[in-house]
């Protein structure tokens, strides 16, 4: 049986020492799929930690399919957690008052691959792998339920039949649903000065699509358009550098760090 943990150590430029476990995800599981996680520090000093749903069918946890744990508030699986810097539940997590585990900040997630904060608006964005199709870009809010597996644009890997409905009352729709799947990865919100027309846009790396997706947003965070930047290699992460340029890290035998510039 396996699980995910949050650990802390000190990196001296060559190695990590003093490793200690700060937090362990509840509900051990079998299999080697869908652990998580992405980490994101917030301005208040708390940490967001994404945890995946536990795995694809036929994997089960108890008498339920593993993926159904994303709708179970008594487990951390399929959720984003908000923790203090010592691994404790952060105060004010809204679902605790409804009986959820106190660390849970949002739920109904399948397998988050990118997590980023817009430094201007403060909005939190996440990219998420769907099953067969139905990858998502979500605007994540505290207390939100993002539907998996009841609400999804994806299909079952084996049967290719829909897993859930496209819309379910009380659950939050994705800002973007990608069908077919680009297999999104790392995520960044651009606020630099090198390409002013891109300010405020979300950039998502693509593993299967071998590209970067730019999602343009208006001031309210609504999607106004999309562009595709062909890279020709699996893109594992996208980040804005301190110099204001956008960088992409490829996931290949001979991986590269690429700087994106305007033509």
Please name every model-derived segment.
Residues 24, 31, 107, 179, ...:
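WD40 beta-propeller blade-start loop/N-cap
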Residues 237-263:
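Blade-level signature of beta-propeller repeat domains, shared across WD40, Kelch, NHL, RCC1
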